[in-house]
Amino acid sequence: MRPNLLWVDKILDENNEAGVCIYDLAFKPDGSELLLAADNKVYLFDVNEGGQMQTLKGHKDLVYTVAWSHNGELFASGGADKLVILWNEKHEGTLRYSHTDVIQCMMFNPCNQILLTCALNEFGLWSTADKNVIKQRSVVRCCSCAWNTDGTIFAIGHGDGTITLRKGTNATEEPSIIIQRDNEPIWGIAFSSNRTFASRDSQGNPMGIDEIMAVIDWNKTLSFYSLDGTFIESKNLEFEPHCISYCLNGEYLLIGGSDKILKIYTRKGVLLGTVAQMDHWIWSVTVRPNSQTVAMGCVDGTIACYNLVFSTVHCVDHARYANRKSMTDVFVQNLEYRTSSNICCHDLVKKMSLYDTKLAVQLSDKIQIYKQTGGVSKNERRKQLKYTLQDTIRKDLSFSLMVVTHGHLVVCNDEKLECYDFKGIKKRSWNMKSIVRYLRVLGGPAHRETLVLGTTDGGVYKVFIDNDYPILLDSRKTAIKCIDINANRTVLASIEDTLVCKWSDIATGETLLQEPGCYSVVFNTVNENLFAFTTNNMLHVRTLAAPGHTTRGVGYVLGFVKNRTFCLVQYNLIPLEVPYTIHLYQYIERGDFKEALRIACLGVVKNDWKYLANKALDALEFDVARKAYKRVRDRKMLRMVWELKKMKSNGEPDAILRATILAYTKKFREAAKIFKENGFENRAMELFTDMRMFDDVQEVMTTASGETKKMLMRKRASWARDANQPKIAAEMLISSGDLDKAALLIIDNDWLELAIEISHKIDRSDLETMKKLSAYFIRKHEFGLASRIFQSINDMKSIVDMHVNAGHWTDAFAIADRHPKYVEDVYLPYARFLAERDRFEEAQKAFHRAGKEQEAMHVLEQLTSNSVNENRFADAGFYYWLLSQQYLDRSQTEENLTLLNKAKEAASLADAYYAYYPVFIFCSQPFSFERNENILNMARYLTFTPYIDNISKVFVYFTIAKIANEMGAYKSARTALDQLTNLRVLPQFELDGQIEVMTLNIRAKPFTDVESMQPMCYRCGLNNPLLGGMSCIHCETPFIISFVSFDILPLIEFKIENDISFDEAKELIESEPPLSDDDYNPLRGLKKGIKEIILNRESLSKLEQGHVIIQTFPPPLAPKFLFNVMPSITIAQCKGCNKVFDLDDFEMACLRKGHCPFCRTSYDRNEAFFVDEEEDEDNTNIPSFGQFSRFS
């Protein structure tokens, strides 16, 4: 810091004999005027000129204090006459008010027009908004006052050492904070809003302070407090201070007092130096707003104005830059990665040096060595910098230059250089012939670094840390100002006092280049050929061979790393991007592609990389071209370079390589010209055909052979196909003889006529193409054409598959008849076709014809299981009956007793599910199509069956209870309800309530069934209980029921004697009985106790044919003979399932459903195999098998 005296003056008394004390000073906010409180007047000075402008009179006694408002419209004065006078901007008194005692100090609010005035025993607040002065008595004398920076709080220092802090809105309120101190009076208070002030908490951790208050007293103490009254720290002064003021936005602190010296401190109270030495006590000090100008007043009337100049202390090493901050801090930046670190030294920083990871800082009485510990490695470079104190050299060395290396500190004092280690031990010294003007570290191994220095006699020397003898590199005429050496230590650049920069070869001493008017020069740290230098506001970046880039309006260049220069502009080091386009083009023009690549790697734009790549490719510099194309990620050109390198390794001449490059860059005619000039007409022809330039290829094709012309036709066909002209492409392929490719193209474009035409031309040995054509004809439904092709290649299997896939069953059956080996290929898909349409009997016969018995059984079993699980019990009964027939058929061929038992089991399940379906509908649906009597009979039938899957006994007994109760069978209803009490009723059926109601109601009914509801046995003629069983309880004769109404039919089973065959028995029954035995009944005359009725030949011959029903079953099941006891009741028999029915019920069921209600056999049953020739949408060429043909 260097103070410059601007002007000095002295205020004398009225007799101009002795000076008067200057009690207070105040700058106008715009800095143009300075107020002085001296004697009983207010003096105005012109700050710029230093002359007295005006003297204001209005006070009758000494004026102690003056203050300007924040906007410069008002200023105030007060003094021993107890008056406060307000003056306007024209220096006219506008208002005055008084206190009860001497006015000691005053200050305007920094944000509004509120004035704080302090007398000895009171203080008050005045504002332009409220003309009344709000006053508050003070027990202790008021000595000083100050507002904080935002005007919300004001502080008053008292004579007993206490400080009171109050809110700026009301003076009458009690102090919000009272700071108790020693008994010494507080003569100065100042606030600073600098947020970088740091204190420490109770645990020793640093904490930030928003705003601080500095306080001075005559106990020779400078103290700091926060706004909440917390003590921060204190500093001891060697004098009695009287005035204090912050300057430069709170960065520094000015204090004056009894030692007659105005001193400058840091914001933390660290002494930095002296501003001025006066002859008497310094009583007041103030700082000009927004400037570095300081005014001070002394007891003897002296007024002086100084301008503070802060010199720049800095150093640079490659991309790292360190500079002094706030006089006591070192701020280190890595300008390349934009990271930084602030080092607090708590002392005045005099000099510093930076090298690699080391930083040396000279303080007042010591030198501190720091080591970079954060942001060093490649992975941490983008993280925050961190420096740690490594060593301290506690010596007060005097020197002009200082540099640091890995393990040493080198200082220079005039002609002498001294080397110290980090412990302060002197290791080596060098004595030069003249004063050393410039010193820097070039680098080198640790503890063996190289220094370069310049002297005032023009000598440039190189010094090694471990060598006692300096080496002369160059001699200039005048003193050396700046030196640098390139990266490979071959070229030296030096600037002398005449500002002439010379570049010379270190080995030979030859001058390579000279430039006048240079202020600084630096070589690039990566590329030894690049350097930068500055002239008059110009930055030049060039090489020794050619001029380069020039930028206007920069300072001094201090560093040059990769594509960035670091220039010092005033006090800031600014990184500037260097465009290398000019240098790149210069190297390319000279044909030096390797150096051009090195320049490009420092940083050029994408277009420059492309230009370098293309030029290197033209020059057949494939390595450079590959690296350049890789930078722009041009994969196409990278592949081309790879192919060119491969061609070159295979011995291809340069002419072919250049022609290939021209072809890749779409210069086809130039490439073809090179091909023809070098005797490669074939390559020229391939080039033109690949690019579909057929007009140009004709010139090359004049002497071509037939095979070559065919190749041309193929190329044209390929081009036509790619150009979306497939028809032309097909014609070209036909002309060239590529019928297989032409056929594929015709098929892809769906040209049926061309496909028919080409099918006659294709060789029959080309099976693949013929099959593709036939597949195309099948898609177009041209089955005749496809069949003709298959026949021509003798592929009968494909014909069968074609008819099967198309559903042409008639044609498929005809082929299967002619060729038995294709029976399975025809009937197996046909069986699946029928099964998908629920034509299961026909599907089973088809499966049987195809020899797939297991698959037929699996399909039927799966359908049966699904029907039961889905509660489709009518279908379940039907499927179980079909399943029983299948088991029965298989038992005949395999003679397996297990299959016979399965057939019987399936038949019984069929009966049960058939009977359960109306019961299920009655319980689960609101309406039923069956009569209640029939449903009751079916439920009665189910009560005597064992437990079967999905047949609910709850539904069975609920049906009996409900219908029997309605029809007067109260006993049966009560029995059914009793059974329900032993069963669990599922809640989803919602039957619990109905069952409970019926149970209560049935108690009021008689425990009997009406006689009409009791089944009668047609053999003994006695009635049976409704729930008595499926056989008579008297004679044990089994009941035979009608499978529509489930009523008991008047049928009694009889058997024939063992020696009578079935055919004989049938013949006897069908014979005409004797006239005398028209009403013959075999039950008459039977003895009691006989259960089975066995008839001999005589009895059979007496039977009426219409009274006998014969049920025939496939072997090994025996036929059954049933006798109609009541011939007046006509009995119907289904020939499909052999079930017997009441004729009226059977006819009604068949009329309603169109088939037998049990086995679904239609009336027009036809067991013969036939084919329906009609083709319609629902039934196209589908053959029918037997009795189920109508129920698909």
Swiss-Prot record:
Subcellular location, record wording: Cell projection, Cilium
Name under which the protein is recorded: Intraflagellar transport protein 122 homolog
Classification via SUPFAM superfamilies: WD40 repeat-like
WD repeat feature ranges: 17-57, 58-97, 99-136, 138-176, 236-275, 277-320, 475-513
Recorded superkingdom: Eukaryota
GO BP: any one term: regulation of insulin receptor signaling pathway
Pfam annotation, one family: TPR_IFT122
